[in-house]
A protein has these predicted regions:
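C-terminus-biased signal that marks the final domain/tail of proteins
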Residues: 1-127
Length: 127
């Protein structure tokens, strides 16, 4: 797919990102803006094995290093990091104002509790 318009090479993704960023809707609420940001950034996810230089025989399926591992956005005013991962698309947040940075120990937060995402069956809700 390298060389095709809209491929997954960094220059192609950058040009598309500029175009999408210039057409983003102005939104008043930060949560709406974060969802809009994720909708835009999802256009640039790299599928497993599609990265430049990837080879299907060498693709690291376990580590998935050739694909988009996480997507993040910031609310700089409220100091909140938002992200979702390739294992769970639910948006999560880390509120930096709630973390004590005065200690000497490094704090760790797991990106995923479990590397899975459930699918909720809503068939019985049909009317």
């Amino acid at each position: 797919m390298i060389g095709l318009p809209g491929d997954f090479t960094p220059p192609s993704r950058f040009v598309r990102a500029v175009a999408w960023s210039q057409t983003a809707r102005p939104l008043e609420k930060s949560d709406e803006a974060i969802y809009e940001l994720f909708r835009i950034l999802d256009n640039f996810n790299v599928p497993l094995g599609a990265a430049e230089g990837s080879n299907s025989e060498q693709t690291n399926l376990k580590g998935m290093r050739s694909s988009t591992i996480w997507t993040s956005g910031w609310d700089l005013t409220q100091k909140v990091l938002y992200f979702h991962t390739q294992h769970n698309r639910r948006a999560r947040q880390v509120t930096l104002n709630k973390i004590d940075f005065t200690g000497e120990e490094i704090a760790h937060i797991a990106l995923d509790d479990k590397k899975e995402q459930d699918i909720k069956d809503i068939t019985l809700n049909a009317r």
